[in-house]
């Protein structure tokens, strides 16, 4: 038996099983606390489909299909894919459209054939808006995509607490509402989604995106207010807005149910001046005891610069991440 886990440890754990199983769900699964993990860090690498945003196209209207994306990732030696909802045929930015079961299951079967996991999925939403009807619509959209995630076998769905309206902020779209009031809107909506996710075995991950959630404290406060064992943090390494973004990652890491690993820590515009120190990042991940997928995502600047070629850049970044994983093992 593994030297780090003795027979005595096993028997102690087994003795507690009847007690744990008899507890109410709220006691057995502590809400709003750091994720309880056992064993050492176990890390696998996934590819977020957003890396191929232009090629996939919103609603799957680009020249690259999700199946072809999965095949590329298998050839590149990823462990999994993270097929963002935007790129499925049937996706609607503000509507309730979802892909057909036939399409979902074809992608799932192909990933199985390729030995790829499906590490998660995600959609866009705006819970900071003062428009209550729009927020309610987004709750229903997330519920629809929770069902999609369950059919895919994706354990996590990413949602946002930040506004996704370009050139806007949470202050502007909330019409000047107080932060505590906006946090309550967000928490109530995500809690409803998490309760729905519990019925399908899908965890809701709240991703920091540099607006309402600028720091780990912002993220943790919201997760605690949501207070659900079916909700945790998606730690986006490129979207904290603080003086020490690595410190923010370290603080949020114990709450992580998934990650988004970017090439820079201060946004795509500052990648050259603030590239991600992958060794430092992996030490943070390992120190937290995280076990699971590290989805990577490459971004191209909007505007004048030439877009990155994901066919070239994604495998290069994957190799760098794998080297950092090996170097910190």
Where are these regions (language model features)?
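Residue-level detector of anion-binding/catalytic polar loops
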Residues: 79-80, 117, 155, 203, ...
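The substrate-binding groove and active-site-proximal loops of carbohydrate-active enzymes
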Residues: 94-97, 126-135, 265-267
């Amino acid at each position: 038996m593994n030297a780090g886990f003795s027979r005595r440890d096993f028997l102690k754990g087994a003795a507690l099983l009847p007690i744990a199983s008899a507890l109410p769900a709220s006691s057995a699964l502590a809400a709003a606390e750091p994720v309880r993990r056992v064993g050492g860090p176990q890390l696998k690498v996934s590819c977020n489909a957003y890396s191929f945003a232009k090629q996939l196209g919103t609603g799957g209207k680009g020249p690259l299909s999700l199946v072809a994306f999965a095949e590329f990732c298998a050839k590149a030696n990823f462990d999994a894919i993270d097929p963002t909802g935007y790129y499925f045929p049937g996706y609607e930015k503000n509507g309730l459209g979802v892909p057909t079961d036939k399409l979902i299951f074809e992608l799932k079967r192909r990933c199985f054939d390729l030995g790829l996991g499906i590490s998660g999925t995600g959609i866009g939403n705006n819970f900071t808006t003062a428009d209550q009807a729009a927020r309610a619509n987004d709750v229903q959209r997330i519920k629809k995509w929770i069902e999609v995630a369950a059919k895919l076998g994706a354990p996590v769905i990413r949602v946002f607490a930040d506004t996704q309206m370009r050139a806007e902020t949470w202050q502007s779209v909330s019409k000047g509402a107080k932060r505590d009031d906006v946090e309550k809107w967000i928490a109530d909506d995500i809690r409803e989604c998490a309760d729905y996710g519990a019925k399908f075995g899908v965890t809701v991950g709240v991703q920091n995106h540099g607006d309402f959630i600028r720091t780990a404290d912002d993220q943790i406060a919201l997760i605690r207010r949501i207070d659900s064992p079916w909700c945790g943090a998606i730690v986006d390494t490129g979207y904290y807005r603080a003086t020490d973004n690595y410190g923010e990652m370290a603080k949020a890491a114990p709450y992580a149910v998934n990650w988004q690993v970017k090439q820079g820590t201060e946004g795509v515009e500052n990648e050259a001046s603030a590239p991600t120190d992958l060794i430092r990042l992996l030490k943070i991940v390992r120190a937290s005891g995280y076990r699971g997928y590290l989805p990577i995502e490459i971004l191209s600047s909007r505007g004048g610069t030439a877009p990155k070629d994901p066919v070239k850049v994604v495998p290069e970044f994957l190799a760098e991440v794998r080297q950092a994983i090996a170097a910190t093992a």
